[in-house]
């Protein structure tokens, strides 16, 4: 009976998987024009933060150095100096345009993700009954598994998420979150998150194994530690 109810709630779970993609695609198109108009009228009032300001200055200095180096090879005639100023002016305009596009995409992605989060929260709230049925079926399914399979599953999941080789996966995941919000990746922040977040998760898992599993199924804990060794 529970299995039939769980299968009946399966379309709801499938819709949860595809809903973020659909919301993101739809609202990106709907909000794009509005965000462009808002950005064009309000961008002069929005200050750059320290990281963005530093990036713009670094790009401008690199651009200036390249033009100066190119002109040093040539003769310093009046024509060449005019070309230098014209080239610098064009490249500066392009640099400002690229920076504006970067800010525009940050605002667009952030707004879309907020709307997506609000819609998903409401969807979870309205589908509370389906989630409860599916959760009951999952608990019954896991309870009927042998301790060996349970220990193997826990070991597999923990190794994938917080194991020695999980660093690259965390870098890709955090990088995808940065891209999803339209943010420029910061290697120092990503490195800090990769070095600390798995450690926190590892501590939580160890506490859960010690506090919960050791009380519910001591044999499972023994098998888990045997496999882990």
Curated annotation (Swiss-Prot):
It is found in: Plastid, Chloroplast inner membrane. Its main location: plastid. It catalyses: K(+)(in) + H(+)(out) = K(+)(out) + H(+)(in). GO terms for cellular component: chloroplast inner membrane. The chain crosses the membrane at residues 7-27, 106-126, 154-174, 189-209. It holds the Pfam family CemA. One of its GO terms (molecular function) is antiporter activity. Keywords: Antiport, Chloroplast, Hydrogen ion transport, Ion transport, Membrane, Plastid, Plastid inner membrane, Potassium, Potassium transport, Transmembrane, Transmembrane helix, Transport. One of its GO terms (biological process) is potassium ion transport. It is a multi-pass membrane protein. The keyword Oxidoreductase does not apply. Belongs to the CemA family. Contributes to K(+)/H(+) antiport activity by supporting proton efflux to control proton extrusion and homeostasis in chloroplasts in a light-dependent manner to modulate photosynthesis. Prevents excessive induction of non-photochemical quenching (NPQ) under continuous-light conditions. Indirectly promotes efficient inorganic carbon uptake into chloroplasts. This is Potassium/proton antiporter CemA.
């Amino acid at each position: 009976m529970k299995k039939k109810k769980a299968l009946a709630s399966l379309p709801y779970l499938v819709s949860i998987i595809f809903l973020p993609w659909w919301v993101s695609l739809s609202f990106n198109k709907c909000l794009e024009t509005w965000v462009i108009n808002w950005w064009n009228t309000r961008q002069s009032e929005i200050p750059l933060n320290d990281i963005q300001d530093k990036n713009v200055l670094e790009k401008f200095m690199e651009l200036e150095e390249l033009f100066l180096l190119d002109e040093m090879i040539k003769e310093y005639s009046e024509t060449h100096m005019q070309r230098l100023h014209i080239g610098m002016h064009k490249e500066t305009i392009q640099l400002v345009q690229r920076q504006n596009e970067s800010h525009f995409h940050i605002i667009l992605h952030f707004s879309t993700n907020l709307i997506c989060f609000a819609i998903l929260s409401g969807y979870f709230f309205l589908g509370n009954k389906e989630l409860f049925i599916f959760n009951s079926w999952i608990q019954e399914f896991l309870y009927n598994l042998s301790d060996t399979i349970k220990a193997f599953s826990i070991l597999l999941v923990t190794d994938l998420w917080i194991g020695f080789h999980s660093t690259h996966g965390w870098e890709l995941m955090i990088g995808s979150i940065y891209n999803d919000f339209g943010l420029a990746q910061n290697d120092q922040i990503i490195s800090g998150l990769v070095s600390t977040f798995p450690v926190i998760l590892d501590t939580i898992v160890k506490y859960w194994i010690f506090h919960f599993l050791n009380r519910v199924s001591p044999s499972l804990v023994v098998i888990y530690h045997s496999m882990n060794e």
